[in-house]
């Protein structure tokens, strides 16, 4: 196990993770509601995975949930450093839930390739939303 000396103290470093990318985004809930009303299933299938749609549609405040996931996908692309210009599709970034309900993210396709290049081994995701705004933060760790 690696160790490090600080002053006269020897510290053991068990799990050394480095942040390799961060991203944040805010989505306006009314704009997501308008997109769903205007484009319906076409919009939903382009942006969200089937599992994400099942989850959001099972909740009373479904549009807030969709907006939070939209913000998470935007934040993930910022963390990866790709934007949407390098063949990454919206559905390549999927918000899932850990046992106990904590949100996390899985990368697929091109997003997974970029995450691998960064040496990503852990994805920390935080979501929050109100009736008006949804916020997401993504931290990629090696």
Language model segments and positions:
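Short, basic, low-complexity termini and linkers enriched in Ser/Thr/Gly/Pro
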Residues: 1, 6-17
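Core catalytic alpha/beta fold that binds nucleotide/phospho-ligands
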Residues: 17-142
């Amino acid at each position: 196990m690696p160790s490090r000396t600080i002053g006269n103290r020897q510290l053991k470093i068990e799990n050394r993770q480095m942040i390799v990318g961060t991203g944040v985004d805010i989505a306006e809930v009314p704009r997501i509601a308008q997109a769903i009303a205007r484009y319906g299933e076409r919009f939903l299938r382009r942006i969200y995975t089937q599992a994400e749609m099942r989850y959001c549609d099972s909740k009373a405040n479904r549009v807030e949930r969709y907006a939070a996931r939209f913000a998470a996908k935007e934040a993930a692309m910022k963390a990866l450093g790709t934007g949407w210009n390098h063949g990454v599709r919206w559905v390549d970034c999927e918000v899932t839930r850990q046992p106990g309900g904590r949100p996390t993210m899985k990368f697929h396709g091109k997003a997974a390739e970029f995450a691998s290049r960064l040496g990503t081994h852990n994805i920390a995701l935080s979501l929050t939303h109100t009736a008006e705004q949804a916020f997401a933060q993504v931290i990629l760790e090696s």
